[in-house]
């Protein structure tokens, strides 16, 4: 009887532990035991006794990694095409897209801090496996589309500065994985430092080019006012959606919800509220900086190309060759090439992290970062190499714009789950989005979906 009682007690103990482990947290089906980016999760300490400024600065960084996606080479192509063809008109789209991005990225930080999950983990928990697999596949397609833009942009940058043929440049881009691995080994702050430094170089390059272009600032200001022609003109809508896809990018939503968790966030509601405040401030400032860069590209195209009748400039190489005679200074195209190369390098860093978050979150599959990077890059290199070999520079611009439209079409499949999760009190607890924020987020989600339906109808028509 004694042994029977011991066995029963052991079984009951094991059963109780299993029930405790299976007990969902808030409205989640599983406990959030899987860590996002486990190798760097909570690796940056935040001292509770530090000053408010120091605690805020501890959250400085992730927003700039997110901002990289808002000024990648694909964005350059759409902004150049929009500025050269329609002047300053599409500045309004860049502004509205940036406001949408600020709202959505704040929701990413909210989801991560409140639930301890990134967006991919949240989708795996909330949806049946077939639905989660579809969302995973769409997220991977978005990352590959992003990577195609980065491959082409980096290859063109290498060609413009060093004269390396595009075909060889496409292959060289596969080597960037070693730089990323080295920096991650040093610590996540080193990754952020590289990205922020290159962003500074990009800003200086465009500041000089804008000073040389001398745009009509009155027209620039008017360009930030939306017009109905953006929706009624199919060509303008196509480029507008390209700008939207290049600005509010699906992979960035997964990325931000993961890298915010590199900070050591306390367990109390007060600590989480403070973390959310600082993380939102970080991403908002970074995205305003990204808007300045995006607007600079479009303004440069409008002031140099559209003004002189060059209304069909979509290829980055063509823009590079036209800048010197139009701006009257030999260094102008070099600055353009340097900024493009910096954007390409930065984008590869963030796409690698996003790919890691998506695969681990949806599939619970942990690949070595170098292997994950090479798989994604190998898939992206095939179409990029094919276009550069058979069509040369003339085809790369169109492929870049196409990748951004593909990203725009994928966007709703990341935005709707994000808005649903952050509006759900059962999942978010006291950190659920307030009603006004949820209303704005739902409006953004519906607008994005409606614009994509309009684009598809125009194509089918």
Swiss-Prot record:
Compartment(s) of residence: Cell inner membrane
Keyword Acetylation: no
An MF annotation (GO) of this entry: cadmium ion transmembrane transporter activity
Domain of life: Bacteria
GO cellular component: plasma membrane
Membrane topology: Multi-pass membrane protein
GO biological process: iron ion transmembrane transport
Keywords: Cell inner membrane, Cell membrane, Ion transport, Membrane, Symport, Transmembrane, Transmembrane helix, Transport
Transmembrane intervals: 56-76, 89-109, 132-152, 160-180, 193-213, 230-250, 285-305, 322-342, 378-398, 399-419, 433-453
InterPro entries in the record: NRAMP_fam
Family: Belongs to the NRAMP family.
Function: H(+)-stimulated, divalent metal cation uptake system.
Record-given protein name: Divalent metal cation transporter MntH
